[in-house]
């Protein structure tokens, strides 16, 4: 009965958003599968051969790649009011998976990887800032939930997930740029280091502002 009510309650926009997120999660799963079980001569790692023998970097990379899939999957369940209404325990369980993964696994691994980013200082600053912002927003979201301020919890989860989606948008920007203009690969890398997450957080803030303004009318 709950399942039937859940699907009846989904409107077209929500259903399309969930399908879009599921599609991008599937694409990320395909990218991740290329590194399994332990492939160091594929994709991104081909430009990181100088670092592949550094134990802590290599461990951080594979931890980040594999654990990121959990973050994407757990994260996109957090913004459906229907899941919250009909399956509150599932919502909380996935929420704890998401928060634990970001705060203890994927976030710290991403921070370490940012220190070793290609493209010099601009790229390093971008990826380190991204990791710190991701961890910070997620930690605040958890604190707000524990204090019972669920409106603030939702706002910070939106910010956190906007940064989670940088894994997808970075690759989308890279594909768009490389198929539109001819630039040196490292220039593209520096550009997408920022484009991968800055527009996401701007979009999240615009979404939050518009929602806040609608509620005040």
Tell me the role of every PLM-derived stretch:
Residues 1-217:
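Alpha-helical membrane insertion/targeting regions
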């Amino acid at each position: 009965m709950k399942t039937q009510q859940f699907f009846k309650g989904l409107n077209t926009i929500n259903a399309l958003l969930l399908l879009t997120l599921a599609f991008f999660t599937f694409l990320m799963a395909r990218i991740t599968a290329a590194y399994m079980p332990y492939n160091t001569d594929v994709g991104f790692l081909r430009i990181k051969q100088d670092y592949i023998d550094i134990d802590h970097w290599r461990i951080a990379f594979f931890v980040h790649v594999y654990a990121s899939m959990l973050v994407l999957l757990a994260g996109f369940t957090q913004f459906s009011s229907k899941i919250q209404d009909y399956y509150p325990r599932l919502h909380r369980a996935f929420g704890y998976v998401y928060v634990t993964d970001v705060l203890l696994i994927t976030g710290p691994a991403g921070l370490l990887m940012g220190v070793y980013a290609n493209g010099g200082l601009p790229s390093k600053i971008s990826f380190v800032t991204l990791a710190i912002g991701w961890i910070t927003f997620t930690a605040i979201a958890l604190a707000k939930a524990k204090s019972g301020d669920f409106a603030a919890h939702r706002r910070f989860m939106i910010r956190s997930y906007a940064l989670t989606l940088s894994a997808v948008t970075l690759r989308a920007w890279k594909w768009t740029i490389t198929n539109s203009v001819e630039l040196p690969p490292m220039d593209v890398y520096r550009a997408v280091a920022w484009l991968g997450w800055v527009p996401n957080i701007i979009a999240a803030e615009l979404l939050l502002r518009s929602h806040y303004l609608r509620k005040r009318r």
